[in-house]
Structure formats: C-alpha cells, structure tokens
Amino acid sequence: MEAVIKVISSACKTYCGKTSPSKKEIGAMLSLLQKEGLLMSPSDLYSPGSWDPITAALSQRAMVLGKSGELKTWGLVLGALKAAREEQVTSEQAKFWLGLGGGRVSPPGPECIEKPATERRIDKGEEVGETTVQRDAKMAPEETATPKTVGTSCYHCGTASGCNCATATASAPPPPYVGSGLCPSLAGVGEQRKRGDDTPRGAEQPRAEPRHTGLTLGPARSARLPPPAPLPSSLPLLPPFPPRVAAVPGGAGGAPLPSLSPSFFHPRRRGRAEATVGCIKSKE
C-alpha cells in the first residue's frame, strides 16, 4: 500500500503541480476502493481497465451521499495516470526509478546511454561519408563489359588481331541508289540531276514540253476567238406626248367630247396668266 501511495503521489506532483493531493487523501481513496471491492490489490490501480468502473462508482457515491472528496482525489490521480501512460511511463519503471521494489526492470543498456558530443559528431561524419559513397556508387554509370573472344579471326581479311575492317566499314559511304524495275519513270532521275548540276548558276534550263494526249478540253492559246455578235439596234424611243387629244365620239347627246389644249398641261411654256385654268375649245 505504501509503495503504491508514494508512486501515485510522485506522479501527481509531476503532472498536477500545486493541485496534487496529499498522501493521506490518496491512502483514504485506496482504502475506500478496496472496501467497495473495486480493487483486489492497490497495484490494480495501474491497469487502465479499472479506471472506468472506479469513476462510475465514485460518481454515484457522491450523488447519493453528497461527499465529493474521494471523487476529486480520484480525478487528479486519474489525470496523472493518463499523462504517465501517454508518455509511456509504466508502473514498473516508476517503481524502479523510485527504488521502491515490486518490479524488476533492467537498466538501460550501453546502446541507450547518451554518447558525448565528440563521439556523436564522429559517428555522424562516418554515416554521412558512407551515404555519400553509396550515392556516388549508385549514380555512377555502369561500365559496359565488352565480350572478349579468344582464337577468332576476321571473316573479311582472316587476320586474328589488328584488323581495321570494322572501322573502314563504318567510315565508308553508303552505296549509290540503283533504280529498280518497278518504277521505270525514276530510271533517269539521277542522270537528269547530274546534267542539271553541270549547268552554271543563273542559266535557264530548258523546260520540258508537256505531253498531250488525244483529248483537248479547250481551244489552244494561239487560236483566236470569233468576234462577238452585234448587238440589236436600239429600240425607238416613245413619241412625245401628243399636243392635242382627239375627241372621242359618244358623248352626251351624241356630241363629241372637248379636247384639251397643250397650254392646259404646260401652262408655263406659253407664259400666259391663266396658268391654272386652261382654255377649252369646243367643237361643233
């Protein structure tokens, strides 16, 4: 009991600060939990599976009896235990650090002991050197190994060593193009190009005349077109307005209708004063 109280008290002082409960309050809480049957032994308080039942029982007791002292103490203890668990500090390690016994935890091995600054720098330099060498080895291009044959000779000249056939073959120009029989129209292309190269620059080369077949689509350029047909004579213009309108028979009583004088239609032509009224002459 005393060992568990010391461990919990030190944890509360570490994670709760000034609000940490006293050892007397922690002991009273543990005695109550054992009395209620929530803990078989004080060390069961370290297991997270017992935290929820303890919280529920103390909350119900505070609601029924109105005593919240144990619930407040349990809240502080629970916060310290959760913080210690988050930092991966187990109960065995806490007991070993406090020298309370109850658990055997081996001290940290030599690999966990912190090395001096000089040794860390040396180790870091060695690691950097190794990584640099490995990176350079990966980035270096792989050498292509040429297969070496023993007792072989060149199939061109038959010599075993010192043959330059491969170099001569590589530097030789390609063979000239030979026209095939499938395209007879391309047979003389090479000769025409050679002839064209012989002519000096600026000189006009003779143009090949187009080959005409038997079909002609239109007249030749030299042929003259027939003259256009003469236009028809211009139509005669309409005669001017007649000066007088002939009388039309069939008036009232068989009398002919009067005719209008030109001055009625053109009053300004004669310069008379009666511009708006024309002279009407009746015929008997």
From Swiss-Prot:
It comes from Y73 avian sarcoma virus (Y73SV). Residues 128-141, 191-212 have a biased composition (Basic and acidic residues). Residues 128-149, 188-236, 249-284 are annotated as: Disordered. Late-budding domains (L domains) are short sequence motifs essential for viral particle budding. They recruit proteins of the host ESCRT machinery (Endosomal Sorting Complex Required for Transport) or ESCRT-associated proteins. Gag contains one L domain: a PPXY motif which potentially interacts with the WW domain 3 of NEDD4 E3 ubiquitin ligase (Potential). Residues 225-236 have a biased composition (Pro residues). Residues 249-265 have a biased composition (Low complexity). A motif (PPXY motif) lies at residues 174-177. The keyword Ribosomal protein does not apply. GO terms for cellular component: virion component. The keyword Hydrolase does not apply. It comes from the Viruses. Pfam families: Retro_M (PF02813). GO terms for molecular function: structural constituent of virion. Keywords: Host-virus interaction, Oncogene, Viral budding, Viral budding via the host ESCRT complexes, Viral matrix protein, Viral release from host cell, Virion. One of its GO terms (biological process) is viral budding via host ESCRT complex. This is Gag-yes polyprotein. Gene3D superfamilies: Immunodeficiency lentiviruses, gag gene matrix protein p17. Signal peptide: none annotated. Gag polyprotein: Specific enzymatic cleavages in vivo yield mature proteins.
